[in-house]
Design a protein with these regions (language model features):
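A polyanion-binding, active-site-adjacent surface
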Residues: 2-215
């Protein structure tokens, strides 16, 4: 079990053998990378929690800060700055001085999975960390799921039943039985933007709705 009230996974977390093996492999190849479970970014008293699927290889797995160092972070942090959820300058570096405002960023799986695809057993092993995080965020009002994988894991972490009553739909805002709001967005990956599944305008619309919900 995860220690109470909330602790991030240790840097040598042993829960998922496949992810541990991949981590050790990358530690040998890239000794200057973080190559460890990526801890959440932002304050626990935030009203907004953004949940991604897992760290990116050359992003958070390299830098140690969620969505920092790859294209997904470029789009996410520029959007957070635009809508007042961040202050400072994003330079794709965890030492850039950027800080979040009333916002926190986490991942459903804290370690980098091969091919960016966590296995069901890995979601299950890591879920207690997200559950404990949610439990101590007493001011939380809105969650943003970046992708269907994150959406599904949020519902599981909150034990929302039936999950099928809350389907993943881009820019849909769900009111959950817990009273929390869940906003869905396609993941801000380069693949999704290159293929046209997600545009900058579409992503901004999600956070415009989030801001409106928090100010209501």
């Amino acid at each position: 079990m995860v220690a109470s009230p909330f602790e991030e996974p240790p840097l040598d977390c042993p829960r998922c053998p496949r992810l541990v093996g991949f981590r050790h492999e990358l530690q040998g190849l890239h000794a200057d990378w973080k190559n460890a479970p990526v801890r959440s970014f932002g304050r626990l008293d935030a009203r907004l929690l953004i949940v991604g699927l897992a760290p990116g290889m050359r992003g958070a797995n390299r830098t140690g800060r969620p969505f920092t160092g790859d294209y997904a972070g470029d789009l996410l942090y520029s959007t957070l700055l635009k809508f007042g959820f961040a202050q400072g300058t994003y330079r794709a570096d965890p030492n850039d001085g950027l800080h979040l405002v009333d916002c926190r960023i986490a991942n459903a799986v804290r370690c980098l999975p091969p091919e960016n695809k966590p296995l069901p057993v890995e979601f299950t092993a890591c879920r207690p960390f997200l559950q404990a995080e949610l439990a101590v965020m007493s001011n939380l009002r809105v969650l943003v799921a970046l992708g269907k994988g994150a959406h599904d894991q949020i519902l599981r972490a909150l034990t929302v039943r039936p999950a099928g009553a809350y389907p993943f739909v881009h820019n849909r805002l769900h009111k959950l039985p817990t009273g929390l709001l869940l906003a869905d967005s396609y993941h801000c990956s380069r693949y999704n933007t290159n293929t046209g599944r997600l545009t900058t305008e579409m992503f901004h619309q999600v956070f415009e709705g989030v801001r409106r919900s928090l100010e209501a």
